[in-house]
């Protein structure tokens, strides 16, 4: 799919910051640093999760080797696009979900808000992110045994859906952003 409006805004913000110092390249470098930082953080959190789940040292080293020695991850960080931020956010969301499901962290209101923000970023980084986040959130909500957790997860799903509907149907059109090309209309259904 094409770049989402939100991803384009973040990239433009980085480039405009670089222009304050007379360099578009500085802005591109800032965007790459953002991608690299978020991906490194997500990978570190996933490796930490492996340790907390009791994975052997060998599996932890294999996980680290996969991310350190596979060339695609380094290339991902220097590629100016939407996929690196999306991938890092999905990985971070997966780590948060496992931590929640296994009871590895205490989940207060702040943690639920962070979980909702991560799910929302999945939807904002890519146009088709909603098709990943919303069904997962609904399945999680239905699978929960405790009523309080079910309501919280349902609230996260409803909140993400409401923000995305407002973003796509109110904010974006109000700003005059329109994609009337066939690629924009048909890219999501044909994926």
Enumerate the predicted regions with their spans.
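Short acidic/glycine- and proline-prone juxtamembrane loop motifs at membrane-interface regions
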Residues: 78-85, 125
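Short hydrophobic alpha-helices at membrane interfaces in multi-pass membrane enzymes
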Residues: 57-61, 103-120, 150-155
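Specific aromatic-rich, kink-prone transmembrane helix
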Residues: 86-104, 115-119, 136-137
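Juxtamembrane membrane-water interface segments immediately following transmembrane helices
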Residues: 1, 131, 153-191
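Transmembrane-helix motifs of polytopic, lipid-linked glycan transferases
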Residues: 33-54, 88, 92, 96
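Membrane-interface alpha helices of multi-pass inner-membrane proteins
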Residues: 111-126, 138, 159-164
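Short helix- or helix-capping micro-motifs
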Residues: 60-71, 95, 119, 123
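Extracytoplasmic catalytic/substrate-binding loops of multi-pass membrane glycan-assembly enzymes
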Residues: 1-14, 22, 26
